Every structure is written in C-alpha cells, then in structure tokens.
Amino acid sequence: MIRDFGVTDVVAVSLYTVVPNAVGAVGLILIARRSDRTGERRRHFACCTLGGALALASLTLHLHSFAAMLACLSIAATLIFAALPIFWAVPTRYLSGNAAAAGIALISSIGITSGIVSPWVIGIIRTRTGSMDLAVYLLAALLALSGVALLVGVKGDAGRRG
C-alpha cells in the first residue's frame, strides 16, 4: 500500500511501515489496560474487532491521501493488536483444567491454520482480480465475525475477571 503511493525508496517504505506498528503497540497497551481495569472483555474485544474491520475496509476506498491511508492502517493495527490479548483472557476465564488445555490448543490450531491459508487465499484473490480490495474485505469480514461470535457466543460473566 505504501508503494502504491509512489514511495519507492526501501528505507522510506520501512520507516513508514513502522508507524502503524508503533501506534498499534501503544494502543494495545492502553486498551488492554482499560480492559484489565474494568474487567470487561467481551465488549472490548467486539469493539476492537468491529472497529478494526471498519478501518481495514476503509483502506479499499482508494484514499488519495497518503496520510489518510496511514491513519486508517494505524487505526486498524491498533484495534487488531489490542484485540489479541483481550481475546486470550476469555478462554482461561471460561474454561478450566483439561477443557482449558484442549480449548487453547484448538484455538491455537485454528490460528496456525489461518496463518497458512490466508496468505494463499489473498494471493489467489489478488492474482485473479488484480486488486487487494476483495482480500481486504474478506479479512475485515472475518475479523468482524470473530467479534460478533465472541459477543454472542460467550456468556456475559465469562468475559469478566473473577
């Protein structure tokens, strides 16, 4: 995306790539602290995933401003990064003993599988359509689905610290 705006210098691309990650790291800490302070997980996770999905989808608007694209990417990174530690607090609260071990193993297996499959699917979509838009929409939809699934599928008190 950064190169799509005409930034060709490798060092400049690298430095611009740091921005969403640095903003995301700070946001992760702030949002996770708030979730810990309030003890609320479900809504924090859902807000992060739904907001991250919206920020990702906004990248397909073909923004003509480099700053706007970088801002959308930074917001998406912040919310997606923040969703991860909040998510992992839920299974350990909801499951215990052998169920926790099996549940965490299942979640990890699904995550690893998606890490293998998603680059392949994104590559196929980009090759066939000549654009990343559909791939970004797919990622945004899956991200939103994860937030809704946790919000609907987990009891209200399971997302709270005990």
List PLM regions with ranges.
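Short amphipathic helix-loop junctions that connect adjacent transmembrane helices
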Residues: 1-12, 126
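Loop-to-transmembrane helix entry
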Residues: 7-23, 102-106, 134-137
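Residue-level signature of mid-helix packing/kink "hotspots" within the transmembrane helices
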Residues: 21-29, 112-116
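C-terminal transmembrane helical hairpin of 12-TM major facilitator-type secondary transporters
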Residues: 39-90
